[in-house]
Design a protein with these regions (language model features):
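Extended non-globular scaffold/tether segments
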Residues: 39-50
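Conserved catalytic cores of very large enzyme subunits
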Residues: 1-40, 70-88, 92-349
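A conserved hydrophobic secondary-structure block that centers on an alpha-helix together
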Residues: 63-70
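Amphipathic, well-ordered alpha-helical segments in soluble domains
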Residues: 25, 51-58, 123
Length: 349
């Protein structure tokens, strides 16, 4: 649930690079527990590679069966791309976005209740810039691919919320991070008006340029209810106040709905601890009526209500801790462990 898929790292290393890291750690593993951990990660990532390769094979078969020359060419190119990314790192924008989609799909198959493409415009921009400068990608084609990705995210196979963040600041130096791809992502949302991705636009007063604010307003005016606007001047200090390094805090994004995570750094989340505040108020009213209890003023009622809320929060917190401890003892997620920073390095699920 809320699996942090760390695309920022994945598009650089690819599936093959991830497997190389796992095998390297496996060769050096000393304890049986560590060997089992790395073996599990290797099995899963090999399965990921095989899964993508099966798509490549099926797409090639469809290409042979297709009479329309344009569609046959498209399917043939898709097959070539997927066969490559099944084992090698992506080198073009088309290859990178295909890898992102396949991993997002696999994340849903693994039971991801809420997933995110995180800071898509940041980790995809080097591929976009490279291809545009060399004339192997047009802006229109990039826009079409982004729109296609958005449409795929809205297919029934996707379990729940799929999110994406654009804009913000660079994690290295805190400078403005908005780029041409940030603009295209917003334009795609304005054109399609789809529920997903649940998009956020990050802004930093004094750093974010006027053109990005204008693009945000254009998207809002399109009537699609997107994007949510996140203020870096608020969120980054909030995160650093929790002890998170500023460089990491600058790399935050909205996971699923509005949950804030750090790209590549957070572990999976559990769903629980839901507190229905109106229901608590209603329960207090019914209890007061049943006991024929009255209050001198509203503040007295509010004080008792807040005590009830506090007790429920404590109970929810303890319940959440029990769930987390139970998961640690009974479950493991080698897929997420292969992608989240620190897991492979420390042989920790």
């Amino acid at each position: 649930n809320h699996t942090n898929l760390n695309y920022k790292h994945l598009v650089v290393t690819g599936i093959g690079g991830t497997l190389e890291r796992i095998n390297g750690y496996l060769e050096k593993a000393k304890s049986q527990k560590d060997k089992e951990f790395y073996t599990g990660c290797r099995i899963v990532m090999e399965a990921v590679s095989d899964y993508i390769f099966r798509y490549a094979k099926k797409t090639a078969e469809k290409a042979e069966q297709t009479e329309d020359p344009v569609r046959r060419s498209e399917l043939g190119q898709m097959a070539v791309v997927m066969e490559k990314i099944a084992t090698q790192k992506p080198e073009t924008f088309t290859e990178a976005i295909e890898l992102v989609w396949m991993i997002q799909l696999i994340g849903n198959l693994f039971g991801g209740s809420a997933l995110s493409l995180s800071r898509f415009d940041q980790y995809m921009f080097p591929f976009y810039k490279h291809d545009i400068e060399r004339g192997i990608l047009t802006v229109d084609r990039a826009f079409e691919l982004i729109c296609s990705l958005y449409l795929k995210l809205n297919e029934p196979k996707m379990r729940t919320v799929q999110s994406l963040a654009v804009g913000g600041v660079r994690c290295e130096n805190g400078e403005n991070a908005c780029n041409d791809l940030s603009k295209l992502c917003l334009e795609a949302m304005s054109a399609l008006k789809t529920p997903y991705p649940n998009m956020s636009a990050r802004v930093m007063p004094g750093k974010t340029q006027d053109w990005f604010y204008e693009e945000i307003m254009r998207t809002v005016k399109a009537g699609c209810g997107q994007p949510m606007i996140l203020n870096d001047a608020v969120w980054i200090p909030n995160l650093t106040s929790l002890g998170i390094p500023e460089k990491w805090a600058r790399d935050y994004y909205n996971m699923g709905c509005t949950e804030i995570m750090i790209q590549g750094k957070d572990c999976n989340w559990t769903t629980g601890g839901l507190i229905f505040f109106p229901q608590l108020c209603n329960a207090l009213v019914h209890m007061s009526v049943a006991k024929n209890k009255t209050y001198e003023n509203f503040d007295a009622f509010l004080n008792e209500y807040l005590q009830l809320v506090s007790a429920q929060c404590d109970e929810a917190g303890e319940s959440g801790k029990n769930v987390i401890h139970s998961q640690r003892e009974r479950n493991c997620d080698p897929f997420a462990s292969s992608l989240i920073d620190g897991c492979l390095e420390n042989a920790l699920d």
